[in-house]
From Swiss-Prot:
Family: Belongs to the ATPase epsilon chain family.
Task of the protein: Produces ATP from ADP in the presence of a proton gradient across the membrane.
Subunit structure as annotated in this protein's UniProt entry: F-type ATPases have 2 components, CF(1) - the catalytic core - and CF(0) - the membrane proton channel. CF(1) has five subunits: alpha(3), beta(3), gamma(1), delta(1), epsilon(1). CF(0) has three main subunits: a, b and c.
GO cellular component: chloroplast thylakoid membrane; proton-transporting ATP synthase complex
Database matches in InterPro entries: ATP_synth_F1_dsu/esu (IPR001469), ATP_synth_F1_dsu/esu_N (IPR020546), ATP_synth_F1_esu_C (IPR020547), ATPsynth_dsu/esu_N (IPR036771)
Record protein name field: ATP synthase epsilon chain, chloroplastic
Length: 133
């Protein structure tokens, strides 16, 4: 038995295919979803979506949003998403280093919050690559 997973951003469909299992990063921790899961709606944090296709696991970096589960269908609406396999490791590492430097240089509450968010996004992208390496 499978689940239909659809991952959407405001600009595109990132994924629309059947999967065996997924693990989502929510605001209250990780949640695993298997076929016949109870209906559920949840807020998603910046984090990694793990997707199991048969015996293979894939990753996707999600930049926060919402998920709805019901009738073996999962709809994930996020601000942005990238498949781990599509992320350039060197570019992601450079972005992480820049985000770390920007956090150290941040002045004031607003700059610190924005720098922390950028750092979380950059870390998620790097972790998404490292999980598939």
């Amino acid at each position: 038995m499978t689940l239909n997973l659809c991952v959407l951003t405001p600009n595109r469909i990132v994924w629309d295919s059947d999967v065996k299992e997924i693990i989502l990063s929510t605001n209250s921790g990780q949640v695993g979803i298997l076929p016949n899961h109870a209906p559920l709606a949840m807020a998603l944090d910046i984090g990694i979506l793990r997707i199991r296709l048969n015996d293979q696991w894939l990753t996707m970096a999600l930049m926060g949003g919402f998920a709805r589960i019901g009738n073996n269908e999962i709809t994930v609406l996020v601000n942005d998403a990238e498949k781990g396999s599509d992320i350039d490791p060197q570019e992601a590492q450079q972005t992480l280093e820049i985000a770390e430097a920007n956090l150290k240089e941040a002045k004031g509450k607003r700059q610190t919050i924005e720098a922390n968010l950028a750092l979380r996004r950059a870390r998620t992208r790097v972790e998404s690559i490292n999980m598939i390496s």
